[in-house]
Amino acid sequence: MRLTGISHTSFAVSDMDLSLAFYRDVLGMTLIMEIERQGEFIERVVGFPGASLRIVGLKLRSGSDHVLELIEYRVPRGQRIDLRTCNVGSPHLCFVTDDIQSAYEELRSKGVQFKSPPVRIPSGPSAGGFDAYFLDPDGITLELSQPAPSGPRKA
């Protein structure tokens, strides 16, 4: 097997209009795609007979190639799950910034809920950088990360 890249990250959301307003209008991402999917293809892919989905794709305006895909399952309707980061399978997506304090203050002024102010990373490969977790409208954890002055965060 040869994997050649990562296409996108996807989150299931409860209300596409609310999520789109958050990711596009609050975080400043650009809408690159919006489609409705139903029928045999999507039923087979997701494994739900009668599936009907609204899907959007977003990118950062900075030119990053990574796509964030948001999916609202209209059929079947999903259930809320416990998204605390300690739970197995709980996702989070990290956004890199060169000024975490400014980004933190701007997002807080827009009503974004943070788990803490930016925290300095004390040790390890990212020592000297800063991280802060915040939540989207569905409670999905997102992260702001400012790399250490010595260079960008390594994956």
Language model region names:
Residues 61, 71-75, 147:
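Generic beta-structure capping elements
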Residues 39-44, 76-81, 121-123, 152-153:
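A short, acidic/glycine-rich surface segment
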Residues 83-85:
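Catalytic core of non-heme Fe(II) oxygenases with the double-stranded beta-helix
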